[in-house]
Regions:
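Low-complexity, intrinsically disordered or signal/transmembrane-proximal segments
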Residues: 1-6
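Low-complexity, intrinsically disordered segments with a bias for serine/threonine
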Residues: 8-14, 20-21
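Short, Lys/Arg-enriched N-terminal segments with co-localized hydrophobic residues
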Residues: 17, 23-36
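NAD(P)+-binding Rossmann beta1-loop-alpha1 motif at the extreme N-terminus of oxidoreductases
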Residues: 32-98
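Rossmann-fold dinucleotide-binding core
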Residues: 41-44, 129-211
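Rossmann-fold NAD(P) dinucleotide-binding segment
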Residues: 86-148
């Protein structure tokens, strides 16, 4: 019985790994064959706007929401599609990037996304917030079946403009691998740090090291 149980677990792991590989290959094939994929971005400021422009330059369709009219104009001029609010358009995105400035806006965004997203959709939270804030957002998305990855970035707005960012990604590895090829369009390097929250922990350590160095 013990052997049979272990065999069953191993088979499930293999099946899960194969599915992840297929998902990743599908994205790579779409990119290679010029199939237009869509990424949604919430927040089109200095960082989110840079993500959008670099993704568009890589042939990825970008839909974005930002209440700032100048941000909407920027996205239009870059070749993207600005949206007037959260909506069904988010359900067609391969991934959704959050580039948000405050905990309140993050909480509001997560609440709205929970009412729209399909099970299994991947959301990247790229800001620097407390672990408690990130965990609360993750719990809410878990409850509606979507997946949140903790993906803070290291770099300035100027570096973001030329895709010279380091991303510290954490969360379910299968979800990370599924969207990893898309990250190459707006980052220089992505470090997969393991379980959810490790990305932020790594970012905090990096920030502290910079602070100590500059003291």
């Amino acid at each position: 019985y013990k052997h049979s149980s272990q065999l069953s677990i191993n088979v499930k792991i293999i099946i899960s790994s194969v599915r992840v590989l297929i998902d990743k290959l599908n994205i790579n094939l779409k990119l290679k064959n010029g199939v237009i994929m869509s990424v949604g971005i919430i927040g089109l400021g200095a960082m989110g706007g840079a993500y959008a422009r670099n993704l568009l330059a890589g042939g990825i369709a970008v839909h974005g929401f930002d209440p700032d009219l100048s941000a909407q104009k920027m996205l239009t001029e870059a070749g993207g599609t600005p949206q007037s609010d959260y909506g069904e358009w988010l359900r067609d995105c391969e991934m959704i990037i959050l580039s948000i400035a405050s905990t309140q806006i993050l909480a509001d965004s997560i609440n709205k996304l929970c009412k729209i997203l399909k099970p299994g959709q991947v959301v990247l939270e790229t800001g620097t917030f407390t672990l408690d804030t990130k965990q609360a957002a993750k719990n809410d998305l878990d409850n509606c079946g979507a997946v949140l990855l903790d993906c803070p970035v290291s770099g300035t707005g100027a570096q973001a403009a030329v895709a010279d960012l380091v991303m510290m990604a954490s969360g379910p590895e299968n979800s990370y691998l599924k969207i990893a090829p898309l990250l190459e369009h707006f980052t220089k390097k992505v470090i997969y740090a393991g379980p959810f929250g490790n990305g932020s922990k790594l970012k905090f350590v990096a920030n502290h090291a910079v602070y100590v160095h500059n003291c």
